[in-house]
Amino acid sequence: MFASGHTTPRLGIDLAGGTSITLRAVPEAGQESAINKTNMDTAVEIMNRRVNGLGVSEAEVQTQGDRNIIVYIPKGTNSKEARQQVGTTAKLYFRPVLATELSGANATGTPSASETGGASDKATDKATDKATDKATDGDKATDGDKASGTPSDSASASATSQGRAASDALKADPSPSATSSDGASPSPSASASGDDATAKLQQQYAALDCTDKNARAKAGDGAKPDEQTVACGQNSQGQWQKYILGAAAVDGTEVDEAEAVYNTQTAAGWTVTMKFTDKGSKKFADITGKLAQNQSPQNQFAIVLDNEVVSDPYVSQALTGGNAEISGSFDQEEAQSLANMLSYGALPLTFKEDSVTTVTAALGGEQLKAGLIAGAIGLALVVLYLLFYYRGLSFIAVCSLLVSAGLTYVIMALLGPTIGFALNLPAVCGAIVAIGITADSFIVYFERVRDEIREGRTLRPAVERAWPRARRTILVSDFVSFLAAAVLFIVTVGKVQGFAFTLGLTTLLDVVVVFLFTKPLLTLMARRKFFASGHKWSGLDPKALGAKPPLRRTRRPSRPAAGPVDPKEA
């Protein structure tokens, strides 16, 4: 806990306040009717799953009016990351790359449709059939070109050459095939297409400056999945590149599940692994098989998220495993955020951020203080009862309660940064209720030991013989409590989930403490004279418990065997 730097649990909105984000639904051209109750409810559900996946982060998402959604993020949460999670539409497409080059001030003066720059990546179909996106430098890009075929000639550094390269790329088949490679390769003698759409896209590509934030936001705006488009992306060196992309070959709805994992085998750091549906797997295998036969950069496919290229791996062979992996300069939070967006799906509407404000605590520190005081009073009453009834045994019970409380505090503090757990007032109530559950386990064990002593056994045998019976009772009792907490967690939403989560967590900790601390400690104390001799303040005095005297068996004298009787003399 101290090594991680998280020494206190995160508090929920009701206790510490947080941030309020107001999002406004914006209809696309000709789709004003898309803003309806069904789509708004779907958006709320997806946003809630993104920021509150386990239901314990205390984030709240609710509608306001016909087209506004308000998201409440508790204090201590990365508000910038949360804003990206809830506002990102997360429309994912896999598109073939037709042309790419460095953009704006990052350009080196040698743009061409065959230039891979610093964002050229490699997708290899290894044991797991993962398409691995590794941002590489120029040398590695060259090596990749050699691995996939003979590199094509680069066009000269001039506006005319740039236009020709882009024009030739647009002539390429959007769904590359084995024969499209030669036609797609840039040639100085190639002429611009006369098609209006092609010319317009060529102009957009030539004018696109990806170093401009506004230009990046508008790149590919309004393009349909089955149309060619332009887009921007950033490579591992932080340089912006612009792309001409073909029609989408696979879309995000074909992603069955996504997960953030730390790749230790290839030293790629945090990556996002995706598993496609059966239909998506077939599409992915088809497109990668076609791309593998092309020359760079048309052997690359771009993973496009909300019109921005997040990865552009190149392919050396068809990937048939139905899995893909996105890697790059991700940290854990970024990888988890992307995995959540891919897993929970795209928003049905586009949202614009209207306002971000700081909200105060709904209840404040006084309620938290009152809850802690109530917990302290409950704990004190339990301790007094133990002292009165169990006397010396209360030392073991109090030590066990302190260990359980310490473990609960540490785990709550660590769960904040790991799963976003936030402590609200219902969760505090769950921790208070857990005091009774923990004390109940001690009482069951102590009473079993006392029963054995009443039967006339000494303390050490009584401790060992009582444990199997007490263990079964404790496990059954804790299982029922945990089952109730699990059902409550599943069927409820909002703050009640915090109560159920805390109750279930402390129930599991009760089992750990009883098995690994209470029982070994009682076994150790049974060897001490104070307890073993049955001192009157030990709580295990045989006389006070009404113990039966130990049973003693006496041997009856054996009777002589019957034999012939000598006759008496007269």
Curated annotation (Swiss-Prot):
Biased composition annotated in UniProt, kind: Low complexity: 147-161, 172-196
Taxonomic superkingdom: Bacteria
InterPro entries: SecD (IPR005791), SecD/SecF_arch_bac (IPR022813), SecD/SecF_CS (IPR022646), SecD_1st (IPR048631), SecD_SecF_C (IPR048634), SecD_SecF_C_bact (IPR055344), SecDF_P1_head (IPR054384)
GO molecular function, one term: protein-transporting ATPase activity
Function: Part of the Sec protein translocase complex. Interacts with the SecYEG preprotein conducting channel. SecDF uses the proton motive force (PMF) to complete protein translocation after the ATP-dependent function of SecA.
Family: Belongs to the SecD/SecF family. SecD subfamily.
Designated name of the protein: Protein translocase subunit SecD
Organism: Streptomyces coelicolor (strain ATCC BAA-471 / A3(2) / M145)
Gene coding for it: secD
